[in-house]
Amino acid sequence: MKWLTLLAVAILAVGCHGCESGWVDIGGVCFGLFTESMPWADARTFCQGHGGDLAKVADADVLRDLYEYIITYGLSGSFWLGASDLTFEGDWLWVQDNSRVDRGTPFWAIHSGLFGWDHEPNGGTEENCLVLDETRKYYFNDANCNLVFHPVCMV
């Protein structure tokens, strides 16, 4: 009986899907969507302090599941992800492994611009960090790294 009690406590401490309490399993990876707002570099340090890094979202199913989680749980605001083109303008890389971020749909936002359809990323040297943008229905957008958004961490 003592063994079963310890097992139950261990399962509750880790969570149903192997993620710690407050984290969610999406695609077999534990994601944490936090309410604190901070610039991108601080968000990265914040995630590293939780034993992970800013999230890599390189799969359309994971992007959809993150969107559904945000909507289902009534979260608001935009969320930092773990990619930037800080090293070389226009070369978007995930910080975890330096792999390239896929361009275009289904990841990056497209919206009506002054001269037709405007495709993200479009911010040039002023917008070098990747955000799940609330104003773009949680598609990828490039943003100024000094803006304050919520971190999405992964472990």
What would you call each of these model-derived segments?
Residues M1-V155:
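Extracellular, disulfide-bonded carbohydrate-recognition/adhesion ectodomains
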